Amino acid sequence: MKQYDIIVVGTGGATIVADAAIKVGKKVAIIEKGKFGGTCLTRGCIPTKVMVTAANAIQEVEEFKKIGVNVGDATMDWDTVAKRTWHMIDKSAGIYDYYNAYDNVDVYRGAASFVSDKVMNIH
């Protein structure tokens, strides 16, 4: 059975803890059952921001017309927006490579559950 100083379940916001532990030489386990990056990167904040940015740009074009700047009618190319969104999500693969490069980090794929107060199971 492997021993760790820190076990981080999920690769969302808790990776801040993993980063701090890695920097001071602690033995770290990271457990992720889904895409690396957590909810924010994969289906929350980042995808939403890509879509909101596109929508804001359309609105800005409409505002330009009010001050005499005419750039034509703005339209949304949903295929391009979707590609950009997936590009941002796919960058999460780099998070796995980042952590896997450290000798003091073990990355596990799966769900974690406690067996006892100091023992975890990955399934």
Language-model segments: residues:
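N-terminal Rossmann-fold NAD(P) dinucleotide-binding loop
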Residues: 14-17
